[in-house]
Amino acid sequence: MSMKISEKKFNDRVGDGIQDSFMRGAVTSAQTRLYTNRLKAADELGNWEEWRELGEQIRQHTLENLDYYLMQLSENVSKRGGNVFFAKTKEEAANYIQEVAKKKNAKKVVKSKSMVTEEISMNHALEEIGCEVVESDLGEYILQVDNDPPSHIVAPALHKNKTQIRDVFKEKLGYENSDDPYEMTKFVRKHLRKKFMDAEIGITGCNFAVANTGSLCLVTNEGNADLVMSIPKTQIAVMGMERMVPTMEELDVLVGLLCRSAVGQKLTSYVTVAGPIQEEEIDGPEEFHLVIVDNGRSEILGSEFRQVLQCIRCAACINVCPVYRHVGGHSYGSIYPGPIGAVLSPLLGGYDDYKELPYASSLCGACTEACPVKIPLHDLLLKHRQVIVEKEGRAPLAEKLAMKMFSMGASSAALYKIGSKMAPVALSPFTSGNRVTKGVGPLKNWTEIREFPAPSKERFRDWYKEHKKGGDK
């Protein structure tokens, strides 16, 4: 899978999402639950806004000194016996991982959840050279078996219910029991256990890399990442270059923010800090590789969008987004959905595929308020719109013509006078009382579900002129 998850046009994807009543119900229920849990977990701290400010400061400081911390991380991983590869592009990252697999004659690979491996199409790259790649995160495994893309950063199978999951297992894996989550989890655990034991390579993502120790931190609720790191003889960790913290102290803060914001827990079931195996340790990989992926992040770092790199992938913004609630994750056409995806996807994937996403927002600001590291997401969406129109020149032709006509009318006193007199007459067939209740063209989509005020028949200038004559102040 690559970053782009659909070849359908944006409007078609949105239409599919709106028509999927089950998906919208599942998303609404999940958003409500996750939102409530996040508020409870935040209230336990008592000073949530101070923690957010601290998280923002840590992320900004790290990004401002990213070159230093990346070099420090690389040196410390190397000192501990690991191999570090800096990949400028997604192709370089995928090729390096392919080469490691070839040298190890690997045929079986097990991996834990990782957004950046999806971004670089890693599974496809390994399958090209004959490797079987198995997802070990339960949600990702469900989607892999069903050949279905993720719809959420933290809960990738959010759009499926337990009956649908049972049917997938029944059809693809020969599952014969009920749709009880415990029974299905037990079945998958037994199925995956052999995959862990047989794999020559284990591949993980990285929630945070600690510069001064050369350690990686993984946050999970299933423990699968721990098995991926400890059983296969070769481990490959893949991380975006921005996923850095200077020391364990900063890690402590950000892990707390991540767990509370993502799932409403003080900590997830497993928070693992590891790296290359040391002499005194009895388990872990014999060979360790860290792949640090740029793939456009350097350009973002030097742009007006650099704040998006503060993201810790908690999905708190997704869990409060009204647009996501109504259209679902697949409508975004990217592995990164929701507000964070609407900002990040055009930067990583380009405007050709994702130019509509910055407009898929009500600009209510709920995402900005929810973000634990205070990314001004709605402001960044507005910046995208500005770039699309002013720098890219990608505004639709109808919009360009409409704005041109408005500009001409608004900048000419004579045209403005004529237009203000003609507007009530032109809209009268579509007006009931003082409201426009039905429209034509682009107005039709608006008036199908709402009304807007009709232009006043009496212009302000005429009213003012009349009252001025009468001396009415």
From Swiss-Prot:
Domain of life per record: Bacteria
Listed GO biological process terms: lactate metabolic process
InterPro entries linked to this entry: 4Fe4S_Fe-S-bd, 4Fe4S_Fe_S_CS, FTHF_cligase-like_sf, Helical_ferredxn, LUD_dom, LutB, LutB/LldF, LutB_C
Keyword Iron-sulfur: yes
Keyword tags: 4Fe-4S, Electron transport, Iron, Iron-sulfur, Metal-binding, Repeat, Transport
GO terms assigned for molecular function: 4 iron, 4 sulfur cluster binding; metal ion binding
Sites where the protein binds [4Fe-4S] cluster 1: C311, C314, C317, C371
The 4Fe-4S ferredoxin-type domain, residue ranges: 302-332, 351-380
A Pfam family recorded for this sequence: LutB_C
Binding site for [4Fe-4S] cluster 2: C321, C364, C367
HAMAP family per UniProt: LutB (MF_02103)
Function description: Is involved in L-lactate degradation and allows cells to grow with lactate as the sole carbon source. Has probably a role as an electron transporter during oxidation of L-lactate.
Family: Belongs to the LutB/YkgF family.
Protein's UniProt name: Lactate utilization protein B
Native source species: Bacillus cytotoxicus (strain DSM 22905 / CIP 110041 / 391-98 / NVH 391-98)
Gene (UniProt): lutB
